[in-house]
A protein has these predicted regions:
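Structural/interface elements that position substrates and couple domains in central-metabolism enzymes
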Residues: 1-459
Length: 459
């Protein structure tokens, strides 16, 4: 099958690369020439500057110029195409609605080219971007408006966790396809032939609207799990001194009806999907006159989590951040990615600087490049107070307190490094519960505050 993937961000690049593994002729299209040059290089460092996913560079290196091609000239490859996957950004507007300007600009261009093509074979435009329910119908209208012959529309939402996207593309939990005609379903089945009738993969065919809705409900439910544990489980551990968070989690999730996913407590979930998607769903339902109280509570709890540990440090430990040097470990929204979109660290940095912190000494294994883009001093002069280091130990040196914001494995059990690098009085603020032996720290004179636990004062 000849496939075009329009958009080479996290979703598009991963989808294009994995499709090429299965022998499809895949053209990854983007207007950003710098991105394309990085991908063509097959160099992990250059690729990782744009999309940092384990295993992705090796797939690109193995398949480029054989099954996988990168291009900024879509007109030259439009003939003979079986499917065009739309993997385009749909960022939130201020009111929570999805900004579809990038999406429809690309669609207009594609429709113009498709209307002029000489080949008469069936082509399917496939929404892989997360788009509001009903967007597939708008896409159908565009095809009619431009008089595109023999073209169909399908919805095929992605469910890729960042940091594990390659493996989940190869072995997904489910593949959801929404379309109206058997002809369009048949084309998508040929693309995903390895998943159809697979004993461990649910292959679901439905309407476009249902497929669009599945993505929103799935992401909202995942964020609900996280917000429930942060809003209820963590509050118990912080309020009642003898509640052990890990035992609480183990006891609750021992019930087979209750998922263990999301049962960890943290300083909030981030990334490109959860916050954006729940805001879009709230907007869509509100516009339709439906109540959204529960969804707004889920979103509000998650946003609250991102900075509430700073408030707790002031309230419970009497900390004043004015003129302090704060070590910040973790900038990405979670481990195994360099993605900082909606990361808790963004709110942490802004809040610390607003409270008068004199310096933020930051370290992340892979996200420092992204951090420099987000924290550009040209946008806010206070960002000049952020300095970046090559290790946790270097970031800790000379700091007055520590904030752990990302769950990188190398941050787990930092007690010895802390003791060797900084001396008490010193406060550890643990947003990911990465230090299981925190009692040993407090016995040696360090203060400790973690999500899900009350303040542990130095002994």
């Amino acid at each position: 099958m000849k496939i075009i993937v329009a958009g080479t961000g996290f979703v598009g690049l991963t989808h294009a690369a994995v499709c090429s593994e299965y022998g499809h002729e895949v053209y990854a299209y983007d207007i950003d020439q710098r991105k394309l040059n990085a991908y063509r290089s097959a160099d992990p460092e250059q690729i990782g500057h744009y999309v940092n996913e384990p295993g992705l560079p090796s797939i690109i290196a193995e398949n480029k110029d054989r099954y996988l091609f990168f291009t900024s000239d879509i007109e030259s490859i439009i003939e003979g195409t079986d499917a065009i996957f739309l993997c385009l950004p749909t960022p939130p507007n201020h009111d929570g609605s999805s900004d579809l300007s990038y999406y429809f600009k690309a669609v207009d261009h594609l429709c113009t080219l498709l209307a002029r093509r000489q080949d008469t074979r069936r082509v399917v435009l496939v929404n892989k971007s997360t788009v509001p329910i009903g967007t597939a119908r708008q896409l159908e209208h565009k095809l009619r408006e431009y008089e595109v012959p023999n073209a169909g529309v399908a919805s095929n939402p992605e469910f890729l966790p960042e940091g594990d996207a390659v493996e989940k593309s190869r072995r997904p939990d489910r593949v959801v396809v929404g379309a109206d005609t058997e002809e369009d379903f048949r084309i998508i089945r040929r693309i995903y032939s390895q998943f159809v009738n697979h004993v461990r993969i649910r292959y679901i065919e439905t309407t476009p609207e249902t497929a669009e809705g599945i993505k929103y409900v799935a992401n909202t439910l995942l964020l609900t799990y996280i917000s429930f544990w942060n809003g209820v489980g963590a509050r118990l551990g912080e309020t009642f001194s003898n509640v052990r968070m890990e035992d609480l989690k183990r006891g609750v999730t021992a019930d087979n009806r209750i998922s263990t996913w999301g049962s960890y407590v943290s300083n909030g979930a981030g990334g490109s999907c959860f916050g954006k998607d729940i805001q879009s769903l709230i907007y869509q339902l509100k516009t339709a006159g439906q109540p959204t109280d529960m969804l707004q509570a889920v979103y509000g709890i998650n946003e609250y989590q991102k900075t509430y540990l700073i408030d707790r440090a002031t309230r419970e430990a009497g900390v004043r951040f004015n003129h302090k040097k704060v070590a910040l470990l973790g900038l990405a929204f979670k481990q195994r990615t360099n993605d900082m979109r909606d990361a808790s660290s963004l709110k942490v940095v802004e809040t610390l600087l607003a409270r008068g912190a004199n310096e933020i000494r930051a370290y992340d294994p892979v996200a420092i490049g992204e951090a420099k883009r987000f924290f550009n001093p040209e946008h806010n002069y206070l960002f000049e107070k952020i300095h970046y280091f090559d290790s946790a130990r270097e970031a800790l040196a000379g700091s007055d307190m520590l904030f752990i914001s990302t769950d990188w494995e190398e941050f787990r059990g930092l007690s010895r490094t802390i003791e060797q690098t900084v001396k008490p009085p010193y406060l550890v603020i643990d947003g990911r519960r990465m230090i299981p032996d925190f009692q040993e720290l407090t016995e040696r004179g360090y203060g400790y505050i973690a999500v899900g636990s009350g303040y542990m004062s130095p002994k």
